[in-house]
């Protein structure tokens, strides 16, 4: 739900605006003057950028649910072809099917499909850029709803970005947002009866620079650890979950960070 997204107000408003427009798009484009001014490019596209774990996929899921539509994640392996012109044909076929089904398309890691065109150095580059032009035409002809995600906006070809009505960056959560995430997940996921009793440890954990996804999986790991120990989730379990998440990135808590959390328990 929208409540699951912990984002800056401006970003959250942008997502809600996109979802609202998605809900009224049929009514909107029935207006003759709008159809006359926009003979093409009526599709509703959203580019979500941000570091891994900042909630791009979750935002797409929330939007699709709000619209009451299925969310179809497109495997780029089914789109991208080494043969010139085939990628655009594959995309056109997928877009036509999605428009007929009235679904929301999700292009995860869209850089591979909508990346910057290269400087022309040989015939291969010229053909590759021609394929990109065909992709642009396919995008302009699509009248449905689609969401693209990328870790970095600069990876996407500016020509694609100019055709997108909505471009939003999901930042890493600040300390206040992390505190809210820790408290909310401790209550809803870990079933902590008295979140305030864990207030100090949760505040200490909120000082750690983690993404929303890392916090969510750290709490899940704490739930499993507590079940294994046969008791309720404690600050020690949460700290164990943080350790596991950081290990994925080849990181670990510094002694100072560990002392701060331990002192708060």
Regions found by a protein language model. Name each.
Residues 264-265:
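Accessory N-terminal regulatory regions that flank AAA+/P-loop NTPase motors
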Residues 207-237, 243-251:
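AAA+ ATPase "lid" subdomain C-terminal helix
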Residues 10-199, 203:
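Walker A/P-loop NTP-binding motif of AAA+ ATPase domains
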Residues 252-256, 260:
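C-terminal regions of RecA-like/P-loop NTPase motor modules
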């Amino acid at each position: 739900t929208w409540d699951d997204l912990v984002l800056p107000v401006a970003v959250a408003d942008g997502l809600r605006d996109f979802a609202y427009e998605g809900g009224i798009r049929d009514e909107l484009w029935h207006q003759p003057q709008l159809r006359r001014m926009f003979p093409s490019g009526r599709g509703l596209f959203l580019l979500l950028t941000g570091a891994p774990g900042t909630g791009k996929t979750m935002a797409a899921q929330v939007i699709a649910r709000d619209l009451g539509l299925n969310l179809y994640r497109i495997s780029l392996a089914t789109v991208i072809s080494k043969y010139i012109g085939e990628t655009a044909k594959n995309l056109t076929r997928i877009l036509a099917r999605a428009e007929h089904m009235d679904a929301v398309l999700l292009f995860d890691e869209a850089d591979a499909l909508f990346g910057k065109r290269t400087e022309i150095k040989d015939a291969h580059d010229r053909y590759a850029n021609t394929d990109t032009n065909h992709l642009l035409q396919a995008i302009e002809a699509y009248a449905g709803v689609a969401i693209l995600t990328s870790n970095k906006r600069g990876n996407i070809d500016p020509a694609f970005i100019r055709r997108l009505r909505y471009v939003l960056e999901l930042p890493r959560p600040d300390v206040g947002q992390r505190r809210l995430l820790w408290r909310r997940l401790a209550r809803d996921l870990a079933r902590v009866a008295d979140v305030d009793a864990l207030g100090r440890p949760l505040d200490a954990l909120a000082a750690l620079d983690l993404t929303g996804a890392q916090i969510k999986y750290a709490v899940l790991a704490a739930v499993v650890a507590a079940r294994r120990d046969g008791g309720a989730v404690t600050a020690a379990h949460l700290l164990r979950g943080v350790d596991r998440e950081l290990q994925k990135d080849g990181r670990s808590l510094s002694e100072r960070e560990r002392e701060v959390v331990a002192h708060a328990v």
